[in-house]
Amino acid sequence: MLAYTHGTWLLLLLLLVAGACARPEIAHTPDPAALGEESTPHAHAHPQARHHHHAHPHAPLKEDEQGTAIPAPILTTDNVGIGETTTASSLAETQSMSDPGSVTDTTSTSTSHSTSTTSTTSPAPLPPAAPEQPEYLKHCFYAEEQLCGHTFDGRAETSEGQGSTVAQSEAQNRGGQGNSQCQCREHPTRPNSWYCCNISQLTMISSCSNISKWTNLHVRNMTVEDMDLSNPIFRSLQSLAVTDGNITRLVNAFPRLSALKCLNISNNNISEIHSRAVKDVPHLEFFGMSNNNLSLVPHRNQNKNITLDISGNMRMLCTPLNEIIYTESINFLNPKHSYCQYNATHTWFQSTDKVSVEQLENRKRCVTNCPVIPNYGSCNCTLENIMIIQDNQSKPQCHVDCSNLGLVELPQRLPDNTFMLNITNNKITSLGDYFHTNPTYHNINRLLADNNQISSIYEFEGTKFIETFQRIYMRNNSLSKIPEYFLNNALMDSGLGRRIYLAGNKLQCDCNSAKTLQNWLKERSSDIPDYMEIRCRNMPQRVIELQEAKLCQSPPDWTDYIYYLIAAEVLLLLALITKVSYDYWVFKTAGYLPWPASKMPKLPCDWLCES
């Protein structure tokens, strides 16, 4: 009979276990008293242990026919609670087989163990290892986005009464939140680093305790009209990130001599920042303000380099931004895709309503690298416009004006991307080999060299300039000859809209000038607007008026008369033959020779005629 009873209880226990496994959705709500008693030891456990407790729900409970609560087996891999839970289940099963009356006590013990094991408030999981950060972000702290969702969603899932108890218990356990309004938590892996979520007023941060010990703070989803930067909660921070919120203005300034090294206010729809907001932050290395509605960047007035991210601010104005670029040491993050709006009266840029920061930086380089020539003065450099090249990539055109300085040679170095060089009204006699060997001359396509003493343009032969130029101004120089290479190659591709100006140069005119140069000027008259003003130095004529017949005559030579001499000899021979024939006819018919022939002495050959 006893064996039968034990078998019945064993069968009943197996059926209950099978039912619990088949219906895992039946959850057990932990006892608040047990939660308060047992949460403290586990709350201070290693974050990894807290993570495992959160990963598994509490064990479901079933009741037997006598109303006794029997726990279902817990299948878990928790490092902390697995031993206790498994042991309790095994013990309950063993006692049920030996003594049915002991099931209730065993079950109660198992339930207590299960509750205490899983009663810890849902802490944040450990984030994955972050990739190595760039140098400018080495002092920046960013809490992972899932930390906010995990921590505060976990609290929301509990009932109203339990949520209050859990919040108070967690605040006491962490020692950092002495007020229930505090919406901040300490980061699980970074010491002295805190994150706050869903902030609607700064008191949700300032109500936390030990704020003075905080080093890093990341606030997500802050929704306020004005954020006061002078609040003491920011005094001791080295890294402050306020992201993904809705803030209208940043008012006031950070405290004097703030320790802040990294500041990120991205993705907040901010439209205004106090002009002196970061003026007294001497150690600031990174300032991220991307994806807002800002039109101005606050001044720093600091000499230290800073990395700045203004991408995504489509209302940013170019004029004040350009002033900051010139006066402060700033490295822009993603300058190709950071844009600003410029005043339409500017002439730097060509047919666009927005300008990239990269173009503004190029303008600064154009000006700061402008040539300064000892004993002569400084050139004037401007970024006149933007030239669109292949793949829609813009390239700045730096124009260098070194006119009226009295230079005797070209500048040694030009700014990068110099497309126009103006050296008019100087005393330059030679172009030298700059267009061959100096890389800063390779992009020039406009050369203004009027009113100098340049005597030759042979230096252009074989250069990139002769292939890509658009304008050459060489008026009123000392050119004596235009080389044949230049004539054959300078205007081969008229599709580039090339123009050459040579008026005021007095060339050495000769037969070759009349034949080759004159024809070249006539054929390319549309590309040489002042071709009518090119004159000769050795005759008072313009090149276009030269006459080939006059210039191409050869000096007198005896070979020119040989044909006349031959013709005269032929005529003389014919006359002699005619005279001899006539005398012979007279002698035969009249018997005497004409008087001239009778006076001539006899020759040895006369006997031929006397026979």
From Swiss-Prot:
Residues 31-64, 90-132, 154-185 are annotated as: Disordered. Glycans are attached at residues 221, 246, 264, 269. Residues 1-22 form the signal peptide. One of its GO terms (biological process) is pupariation. Residues 90-101, 159-183 have a biased composition (Polar residues). Residues 43-59 have a biased composition (Basic residues). Residues 361-416 form the LRRNT domain. It comes from the Eukaryota. Gene3D superfamilies: Ribonuclease Inhibitor. Keywords: Glycoprotein, Leucine-rich repeat, Repeat, Signal. Has a role in the ecdysone induced cascade; probably indirect control of 'late' ecdysone genes. This is Protein halfway. The lineage of its organism: Eukaryota, Metazoa, Ecdysozoa, Arthropoda, Hexapoda.
